[in-house]
């Protein structure tokens, strides 16, 4: 019996471009959705832009446009990118929509009526210049525990301490630089602890990924907390009913955006919205997300739905991050590749196939090895799959006017290919795409071996063997048809071209029905080889793109410095003696490697050469150096006799010196030419 299903992807934030990391999730979901359609299931695939929040409000102001203009431009770009990669959404909407406002307001009122919304007065830091309350991440200052400078308002990335923004020493607004004041404000909280029993039961259902189940157990053990769902004006979002100058936090209305996008589709097509969202719905609901937002989708979202007496997700499918050549995507190396840049140079089906060949059901990072990318695409798609069709089609066209044989040359081999149908289907269903691809390519090898063993090019030279030639080549084309049917969810454009050649639609139901006695069209090139020069073009364009952005930012930074030359500087510290200074062992060090700490918003990890040994130093200057790889080879000054500090993200064996007020306004100290690693600063 046909299943009714609704599938979503995480909503891309409307404050930046789509990159190949985003595309992993959307390709994964699209393959699964296309497979379900081939199996005859009634499935709807929706998404939207996540269009609210302080970052969007501030970015729009920085650009001199309205938030509405910013998110409209982002949506246009995002839709074009997804279309370019053949992501087959039934609807792509925005959280800044009337449907989302109505559903968000309705759900909030329902939660409030059911007693799940609490309110209390909290103290917050307030920017007197911008006249706005400051979220934790928009406050910086000195850690009250370890005295590390330029730390965020909620936790220290040097000593891993957590604290209130009010505890920061010398706090400042990350928006204006002003010293914030403390103001009280009433906030609204979602009572998540009330749903602990339901969430534990949901966790024990056995359908969630084991990694999610284990993580949820950790959160249960540490204790669930009430969730602040409100933000004070000014804020770009939806106003909270009956609460002046209060707005819903972006993470409240973002997942509701799934419902809003589907509601928009229902209103246009006549679908029954309630059938998919009512508490006792027999339909299936699946969310594809990245591992970084499991917390919201496995705790807050199902609890909110349950509190509104709506259905919970059937499952949440999380995936890992994308790395390129074994390391985090890098702007300076040209591997932080935007979808639009990729599409200018490379067929999107290449990436769809490569991701599919590596994706499984676990939450694992996926490495895009550029050399392997080229090799695998050419080996599998061009040399094996497409070549299987081309080497047989030429004989059918020239010798038999495109007509295939009336019977199968090798019924046992055909039966072997058909027998794998349900196993391949099971791999697709379980999101084990790598296993499906491996099995399909094994069959492809068998098909090519069949043609090699039969050698139609030899048969073609033998008199009186036309029937045998037609039978062998028809068999080769028949096996190609079966393989393309299996690969249609992964390679929809190639499948469409194959359908034009075969003059039949590729469906799961007709896989076992051979094209006996039918005609095929004249063969045209189905797929082009992937060349290294195409990869190089993408890398170089990416480097140029971000180099231009950095140049523009540097220009703005210089103008800012020029405009603030006469502003006050920090006062000179208390006087010390020469003996105090002598306690510091300052050394010259050469940067061997430098990379961002993925889990940290502040830290860079340095490997430093001090002449006779090397050291690792973690430094909180990430905001000032967007391209840490460019620091390799540079000489810096460090405090060499500072006791090693065990931090959340590793051990730091010293301190690198820099000057500035903090954040992006930090500058590493360097030395003149001729300096050598290990030299002492005197």
From Swiss-Prot:
Molecular function via GO: ATP binding; metal ion binding; methionine-tRNA ligase activity; tRNA binding
Cofactor(s) annotated in UniProt: Zn(2+)
UniProt cross-references to InterPro entries, sorted A to Z: aa-tRNA-synth_I_CS, Anticodon_Met, Met-tRNA-synth_bsu_C, Met-tRNA_ligase_1, Met-tRNA_synth, Methionyl/Leucyl_tRNA_Synth, MetRS_core, MetRS_Zn
Reactions mediated catalytically: tRNA(Met) + L-methionine + ATP = L-methionyl-tRNA(Met) + AMP + diphosphate
Binding-site list for Zn(2+): 143, 146, 156, 159
Claim: Amino-acid biosynthesis is one of the keywords in the record: no
CDD domains assigned to the protein according to its UniProt record, in alphabetical order: Anticodon_Ia_Met (cd07957), MetRS_core (cd00814), tRNA_bind_EcMetRS_like (cd02800)
This protein's UniProt keywords: Aminoacyl-tRNA synthetase, ATP-binding, Cytoplasm, Ligase, Metal-binding, Nucleotide-binding, Protein biosynthesis, RNA-binding, tRNA-binding, Zinc
tRNA-binding domain residues: 580-682
Binding site for ATP: 331
Compartments in which it is found: Cytoplasm
GO cellular component, one term: cytosol
Major localization class: cytoplasm
Co-factor note (free text): Binds 1 zinc ion per subunit.
PANTHER family (UniProt xref): METHIONINE--TRNA LIGASE (PTHR45765), METHIONINE--TRNA LIGASE, CYTOPLASMIC (PTHR45765:SF1)
Protein name as it appears in the record: Methionine--tRNA ligase
Organism from which the protein derives: Actinobacillus pleuropneumoniae serotype 3 (strain JL03)
